[in-house]
Amino acid sequence: MMTSRLPSCFGLRFYAKRAATIRAKPSKLASSVGIGAKRSKKTVKKKGKEVDIFNYGKYVGLKERDPGSETKGKELLDKLSSFDQLKILPEVRNSIKNIIKDETLSKKAKESEDVIPSPIQLIAMKKLSRTLMDPKLQHHAIAAETGSGKTMAYLIPLFDYLKRQETEFPEDWEFMQDKAIIRSVIFLPTHELVDQVYNTVKKTENDLKFHVYKWDSGTKYPEIVEKLKNRIDILITTPAKLLNLFNIRMISRADRLLSEVKFVVLDEADTLLDKSWVEDTHRAIRSLPNTNHLLFCSATIPNDFNDTLERLFPNTIPITTPRLHKLPKSVDFKIIDSSINPFKGSKIKALAQTLYAIANDSSEPGFEKRCIVFTNEKKDVPYIVEKLKVTYGHDCIGLTSNDSVEERLEKIHDFITPPKPITMKKETPKIENEDSVEVEGSNITIGDFSSKTSVKNSNSESSLKVLVSTDLMARGLNFQGVRNLVLYDVPQTSIDLIHRVGRTARMQQRGRVFMITDKKTKSWAKALPKVIKKNMTLK
């Protein structure tokens, strides 16, 4: 295991001046992930046992976890296994179960009479329910591995809180139910995530009677003004959009609209509090002066994020799972070495053959396959897409920040919806002059590539759709049932690695990740299959 000797920076410069004069106490979240842990540390003791920690990447990106918090999480999960064991209003419990059953791709789960909550859903609701209706300001940070059901982990207490306001404080509810107010806000960093969370939350409109609204890039000012004439129970938007309320001339007192906001969620909080977002996010939070609950939610706890919580919200209480900062156990991780023959150092040839193998294997019978390809640089996306389409005949699209929100939503549609059944046998790309060669340590069979390799494909449609993008698509999006993922470039940090790999193998489903390496690839990247096998925590 390699250990980087580079410094574990970087703090937020935006707050450097304030930090120099005021030293806040370390938050409980900081202690839960091991503030002050040394870079060279590879194992920690837990009741006589050693817990492996793997130093991935050029920099130390993630805080080490306190083994004690992992033990507490496991002890709590040993006692809980059902929504019925949690303090949730019956109508909220039923609504949550219906949503989870509706959104799952598991046939067994859909047909089951009961719905089993995920670990983070159990732990979060158990801890939050103890003081849910306590009027004092409460800060909590929900942190769990990718694809673990974190969205529902914060929606359950939010729904329960709003319904308890109505039932436990009837006089207050009678006064506010017809007022032009906003009761809760969910902040997200991208409009794709705003749309995704909205599509989940709006399913409560019939049974829980919540008034749900999303304010995204396509919303016109007259529309939001008209909507704000009535009560909004849950507003889903970005911090910048909320701040725009104070710039709309048709709204005279934005502060009054926000005065009844009691529950605030920051989803993908490590992004919303990074140095490019933190000013807008902090201003948006300060515009909600009567907040009762402030929830931060993230799949990773980067050093910078933890430092920001220490400075701005030092009383934050952590809610974490034992698998935080670990790659999914259900992912099958393969290394594809582009430096060996027949690729001769060509990563694009290695990628094309990997996709060819995925398209032609026996996985996902009867359904259209989807694959996401991640690259480190935006400028590489058009090149990869052109090569895959023109030279190798793959059904491929590219997505970057240059695309409009509407274009991005259209491009990702086939990847965030369930896989489509195949009604006819489709021909997949066939590569001429194939001499089968097996790559050791992977399930890829390689053909004989030459610079003039052509593709035979008589059918314009393919049973494999490919999306090429950057980390723009690596955060929070629920790519439903996407079983294949290719890392065209090796992620440089453990943070990027966790979020990219987390687009597959979600909610205990199986997934495959193929990482293309070359002669420059470091040993810490090549060790990833063993990291997953040994259940190691990334740092």
Curated annotation (Swiss-Prot):
Cell compartments where the protein resides: Mitochondrion
DEAD box, short sequence motif: residues: 267-270
Helicase C-terminal domain sequence ranges: 350-539
Similarity annotation: Belongs to the DEAD box helicase family. MRH4 subfamily.
GO BP terms, alphabetized: mitochondrial large ribosomal subunit assembly; RNA metabolic process
Pfam families: DEAD (PF00270), Helicase_C (PF00271)
Domain observations: The Q motif is unique to and characteristic of the DEAD box family of RNA helicases and controls ATP binding and hydrolysis.
One GO cellular component term noted in the UniProt record for this chain: mitochondrial matrix
Species classification: Eukaryota, Fungi, Dikarya, Ascomycota, Saccharomycotina
Residues binding ATP: 144-151
EC primary class: hydrolase
Keywords linked to the UniProt accession: ATP-binding, Helicase, Hydrolase, Mitochondrion, Nucleotide-binding, RNA-binding, Transit peptide
Protein function: ATP-binding RNA helicase involved in mitochondrial RNA metabolism. Required for maintenance of mitochondrial DNA.
Official protein name in the record: ATP-dependent RNA helicase MRH4, mitochondrial
Motif (Q motif): 81-109
Organelle targeting sequence: 1-24
Top-level taxon: Eukaryota
Helicase ATP-binding domain location: 131-319
GO molecular-function terms, A-Z: ATP binding; ATP hydrolysis activity; mitochondrial ribosomal large subunit rRNA binding; RNA helicase activity
UniProt catalytic activity: ATP + H2O = ADP + phosphate + H(+)
Native source organism of the sequence: Vanderwaltozyma polyspora (strain ATCC 22028 / DSM 70294 / BCRC 21397 / CBS 2163 / NBRC 10782 / NRRL Y-8283 / UCD 57-17)
EC number: 3.6.4.13
